[in-house]
Amino acid sequence: MGNYPEAAFKLILIILCISGLLYANSSSERTFSITRPPVEKDIVEETLIDLQAPKERVSSLNRWIRSASGVTQVDPMLLVCLLHTESRFRKEAVSEKGYRGEAQTKRFSEFSSVNILEGAEILRDKLSLSKGDMFEALARYKGGKDKEEARKQAREVLKLYKIQLERRGLWNRQ
């Protein structure tokens, strides 16, 4: 019975992820609601390619990031930049502290879609706690808003985010 809570948690995350995929593929897709309106071209896929995500995973990563964004309402471009800095999109990545997966979270699943959703939910919660302040939320995600290393890593994500938006002509919409 000791694994019951973990198994239940994984099942809930999988259900949320599947519902997010259904939502993200519906005609009412609203995946860019936090920072900007949707755009016509697939900037998430372009950004994954630009940031050298493994070619064989670009399509799947794009779907999973859009799904997680649909569930959490966190900007998918911000998620792409966060995942790049956390793991370079590698499922097998493990941090010095033992965090695992693409989003480098405490909870790890064999399913990348669940790992990405977990990271998006954590970031959403950090954004809420930080009253929408992206820098503070990212610093909290990276280890603590008052820790210099976490603040440095948060600046790295925001710099990458700005560069990617500028490359796609979207920075002025901020």
Regions found by a protein language model. Give the residues of each.
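Catalytic-site microenvironment of enzymes
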Residues: 10-12, 19, 152
